[in-house]
Amino acid sequence: PSGSTERTKSDSFHTFVVMDLMNGTEEHFQHTIKEELTISGAGIHTGQAVTMRLKPAEPNTGIQFQRIDLPEKTIIKADVDNVVETNRSTTLESNGARVSTIEHLMAALVGMQIDNILIELDGEEVPILDGSSEPFVQELKKVGTLKQNTPKIYYEIKHNITFIDEDKKVEMVALPYHDYRINTLIDFNSPVLGTQHADMKNIAVFNDQIASSRTFCFFHELEALLNNNLI
């Protein structure tokens, strides 16, 4: 981003913020939602009904979940260090409290470029709704987003970073780049779907082009999902 910056360094990336807020563009600022909203539904894995209340949050809060059904009303930060499970869904845990199947809601928040929000839940699992991010995006659009007078924190990597999970046959590579770009390739080893490829050069296209993508599974996977209490 253009404008004055302040940087810190690590072995893998620079951290910097845009200091010249007068000349900063909309994307340089943190955002929250304008007002509270409520979303209810059932979890796809637990089958339990859950109600979520999404609330505006102060700058630098980040994305936080709160289990209001628990006596401690534990807050769980949406942080990679809190990820404890990724089998068919993503689960976060903090101080013994869990929140699961967060990925579609998280995608909607990223697509809407929302930085700060508190999500209260009266159960463990985020509702699946129609199996995509689109219902979350539509509800967030109804209340709108609010620009906060606080700069975003940016991470700029200095060299290639590679992550490989041999068991799940996943490889991710982050490359230094002057702009935003995500390139994905997936092969389901199936004659029905085959190999699929997508290239996203601007997060602004998420709502129209990606949010409606839905969860699915193959028929031959059903037995394993049932045996592992995932459906």
Regions from the PLM with identified roles:
Residues 11-231:
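Short acidic-hydrophobic catalytic motif
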